[in-house]
Amino acid sequence: MGKIIGIDLGTTNSCLAIMDGKTAKVIENAEGHRTTPSVVAYTDNGEILVGQAAKRQAVTNPDNTFFAIKRLIGRKYDDKAVQEDIKKKVPYAVIKADNGDAWVATKEGKKMAPPQVSAEVLRKMKKTAEDYLGEPVTEAVITVPAYFNDSQRQATKDAGKIAGLEVKRIINEPTAAALAYGVDSKKGEQTVAVYDLGGGTFDISIIEIADVDGDNQIEVLSTNGDTFLGGEDFDVALMNYLIDEFKKEQGIDLHNDKLALQRVREAAEKAKVELSSAQQTDVNLPYITADATGPKHLNIKVTRAKFESLVSDLVMRSLEPCKKALEDAGLSKSDITEVLLVGGQTRMPLVQEKVKEFFGKEPRKDVNPDEAVAVGAAIQGGVLAGDVKDVLLLDVTPLSLGIETMGGVMTKLIERNTTIPTKKSQVFSTAEDNQPAVTIHVLQGEREMASANKSLGRFDLADIPPAPRGIPQIEVTFDIDANGILNVSAKDKATGKEQNIVIKSSSGLSEDDIEKMVQDAEANAESDKKFHELVSARNTADNLIHSSRKAIAELGDKVSAEEKEKVEEACKDLESVVKGDDKDAIDAKTKALEEVFSPIAQKAYAEQAQAAGAQGGAQAEEPKKDDDVVDADFEDVEDNKK
């Protein structure tokens, strides 16, 4: 059985870990980094770039460079958050798919579902693991924000499938971090608050770690969060400040210039990181734009105090879910024994200060905020594979689940923070006499009004025998698996007729869609391979042209004018095809140049070696004379001394 790898699929960065014996190990990517930017770019020549390579070219290719895709995953285009937040913050096109989902599109018009883009990041993780292990990897545990709803969880599973991974378990990020901490911690019973402020989402989980019959039991008591609060928002706050300051100085609004906007975004992210350790930083972007008077440069000093004032409301926004999570767990702040900080944004001193103020204790600094989640995912992978024996994980569903009942009310079957897996049934009836069918409208959320909650799906239970209203007994059962994904069934108790729905279509992707995307991904892998072969052929050709001309120049008059002409002609022939996309033509012309150049070079170098050999022979005789001279001198000196 192959390894089950652990992947933290983040909004900004992703991380990979595997179990190495009894411990989880974070694996470096091909570039030697322990985290990989969750950025995917589609270039003009059809190449797909992932990670650092994609991030590096974002400034020159803003329309086709996709970042923060996790904020779109499993969401509808008409969602308020998509309209108000995402569309205003990203340079690429967010479009409405035929099924109403939020998709993205390249400037060439290629439409893609968010799971399809995320799958490219997962595929890079998969390859990194395979390169490290030297064997195929087909199974993974992938983490999601605790506050992700059913649609977002299912969409994440779809992304795994498109990447060629069977997702054995979806686990919550704070839970994974607690798992990483809890497995190493041997301090007995603890109540831990995991404050997870990542690139795109915020979660708070209250978790109990206890020793139960020798097993490390990690039980989630409650969870809360905000799926639209993260480091990206901190970047945008600073970016908008820089743009506003530049507008005050120069009278030019950079919001409409995608290239400039991307440069300012990158500079804001860099400045944010620097301000975690420095009191002030300079943001210096020469030639950011130009007008009739000439080029303009952006040069703005930003102090830590200024940055903190720009984002203080974002930090304060994270504290409300903390209060709710404590209430749901039935605990007070004094009951918390440890506070863990997870997610790169928790490196910001203001965040650490406010968390310390809220919980009344110093957060732990010995947990790596970028890696803890992936480590926890790898440990869960080890549990599922049977390699880790003494850990029991009890997670919860983050939001209440129910159905729409008469009057447009949501009737809850499973309350939020219920330990999963779980199953719950309730009997409902008809609202009208002789009603032949009922529509089961499945909802997720905390509001009383059905329309104010997230719709997960609908299905009909038909062929109900005619009867007065209130007489038929329709048993509705909700069954949540360990991934937090829901199965709903409805059964007419009189006839035994049953209808059920796995909330699969909520990500908007059917099995056929996913299968097509898997095939596209495989085709992309093939085209990527062909592209790399083409680049390799071009490099070989360029090297041969350079070395041929250099050698002919060095050999000078040892090569006849006719031979020089032949080599130059073959070089020009190769140059005429080397920039094209026909690998066979490049290979053929490369071979032709080799066939012309090799015999000329061999002959010339053989003559050169022969001449050198003859010269060497002459030199070999000379030392004898020298020896005689030295000996004679030596004897002469001795004679004089006598």
Swiss-Prot record:
Q: Which domain of life is it from?
A: Bacteria
Residues with Phosphothreonine modification: 201
For this UniProt record, the keywords arranged alphabetically read as follows: ATP-binding, Chaperone, Nucleotide-binding, Phosphoprotein, Stress response
Q: Where is the composition biased (Acidic residues)?
A: 628-642
- Disordered as annotated region, ranges: 607-642
UniProt-listed Pfam families = HSP70 (PF00012)
What's the protein name?
Chaperone protein DnaK
Question: Which organism's genome codes for this protein?
Answer: Francisella philomiragia subsp. philomiragia (strain ATCC 25017 / CCUG 19701 / FSC 153 / O#319-036)
List the gene name: dnaK
